[in-house]
């Protein structure tokens, strides 16, 4: 790299799940230094923290911070933070399921802390794997929320940070195609943790998260060329 060329840096909000791992894989091809930030909020599927740590090493992130946000567990009752609240089955209505698994304020906290981290390391981009195409039950996964918080953070910190959500308008099949585009399909399939019940890889097979993941993979395997073509049309990938 020429001496006078600016180093491109980004912070990836990283859980070790399918979506954030796919975002990390892509970011590593686009930035010189990729910083990851993971949050420990007492989630019942907290095995994801160990998986996130391992994946950042395997994939080659520049740095990885694990931040204690246990206040979320105290304040936000959810089936993801309370053992006495049952994780709903995928057969239930998706919108009703989202009410149980929604952790109020989670992405507000995560993205704000990621912005502070970005400020410290002088990164101007934050990447988050939120998506509202397949499952729009969470209000803090909507594009208009991401844009609004981005504006508020920039005003509050007097620092120009750009929140990017590369998966926002991709369906799950296209997200699998993106992992395959970077030749990491097997890694994402076997080494990530998306399951609400904390089971790596294919997961429990019963929760909404596992169902969406499995259906997306099945669709991609049935129509790989069509799905890859759709991905490229949406993203501009060559």
UniProtKB/Swiss-Prot annotation:
<comment type="function">
    <text>Catalyzes the ATP-dependent conversion of 7-carboxy-7-deazaguanine (CDG) to 7-cyano-7-deazaguanine (preQ(0)).</text>
</comment>
<keyword id="KW-0479">Metal-binding</keyword>
<dbReference type="GO" id="GO:0008616">
    <property type="term" value="P:queuosine biosynthetic process"/>
</dbReference>
<dbReference type="GO" id="GO:0016879">
    <property type="term" value="F:ligase activity, forming carbon-nitrogen bonds"/>
</dbReference>
<dbReference type="InterPro" id="IPR014729">
    <property type="entry name" value="Rossmann-like_a/b/a_fold"/>
</dbReference>
<dbReference type="GO" id="GO:0008270">
    <property type="term" value="F:zinc ion binding"/>
</dbReference>
<dbReference type="GO" id="GO:0005524">
    <property type="term" value="F:ATP binding"/>
</dbReference>
<feature type="binding site">
    <location>
        <position position="195"/>
    </location>
    <ligand>
        <name>Zn(2+)</name>
    </ligand>
</feature>
<feature type="binding site">
    <location>
        <begin position="14"/>
        <end position="24"/>
    </location>
    <ligand>
        <name>ATP</name>
    </ligand>
</feature>
<protein>
    <recommendedName>
        <fullName>7-cyano-7-deazaguanine synthase</fullName>
        <ecNumber>6.3.4.20</ecNumber>
    </recommendedName>
</protein>
<comment type="pathway">
    <text>Purine metabolism; 7-cyano-7-deazaguanine biosynthesis.</text>
</comment>
<keyword id="KW-0671">Queuosine biosynthesis</keyword>
<keyword id="KW-0436">Ligase</keyword>
<feature type="binding site">
    <location>
        <position position="207"/>
    </location>
    <ligand>
        <name>Zn(2+)</name>
    </ligand>
</feature>
<keyword id="KW-0862">Zinc</keyword>
<dbReference type="InterPro" id="IPR018317">
    <property type="entry name" value="QueC"/>
</dbReference>
<feature type="binding site">
    <location>
        <position position="210"/>
    </location>
    <ligand>
        <name>Zn(2+)</name>
    </ligand>
</feature>
<feature type="binding site">
    <location>
        <position position="204"/>
    </location>
    <ligand>
        <name>Zn(2+)</name>
    </ligand>
</feature>
<keyword id="KW-0067">ATP-binding</keyword>
<comment type="similarity">
    <text>Belongs to the QueC family.</text>
</comment>
<keyword id="KW-0547">Nucleotide-binding</keyword>
<dbReference type="Pfam" id="PF06508">
    <property type="entry name" value="QueC"/>
</dbReference>
């Amino acid at each position: 790299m020429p001496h006078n060329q600016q180093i491109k840096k980004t912070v990836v909000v990283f859980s070790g799940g399918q979506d954030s791992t796919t975002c990390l894989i892509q970011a590593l091809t686009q930035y010189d230094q990729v910083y990851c930030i993971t949050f420990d909020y007492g989630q019942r599927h907290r095995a994801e923290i160990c998986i996130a740590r391992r994946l950042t090493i395997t994939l080659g992130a520049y740095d990885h911070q694990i931040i204690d946000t246990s206040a979320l567990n105290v304040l936000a009752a959810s089936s993801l933070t309370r053992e006495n609240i049952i994780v709903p089955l995928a057969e239930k209505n998706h919108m009703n399921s989202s009410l149980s698994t929604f952790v109020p304020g989670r992405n507000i906290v995560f993205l704000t802390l990621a912005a502070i981290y970005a400020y410290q390391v002088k990164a101007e981009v934050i990447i988050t794997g939120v998506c509202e195409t397949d499952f729009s039950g969470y209000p803090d996964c909507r594009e208009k929320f991401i844009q609004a918080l981005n504006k508020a953070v920039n005003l509050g910190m007097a620092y120009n940070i750009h929140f990017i959500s590369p998966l926002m308008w991709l369906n799950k099949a296209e997200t699998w195609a993106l992992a395959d585009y970077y030749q990491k399909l097997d890694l994402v399939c076997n080494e990530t943790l998306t399951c609400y019940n904390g089971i790596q890889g294919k997961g429990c097979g019963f929760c909404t998260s596992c169902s969406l993941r499995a259906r997306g993979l099945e669709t991609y395997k049935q129509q790989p060329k069509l799905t890859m073509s759709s991905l490229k049309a949406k993203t501009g990938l060559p």
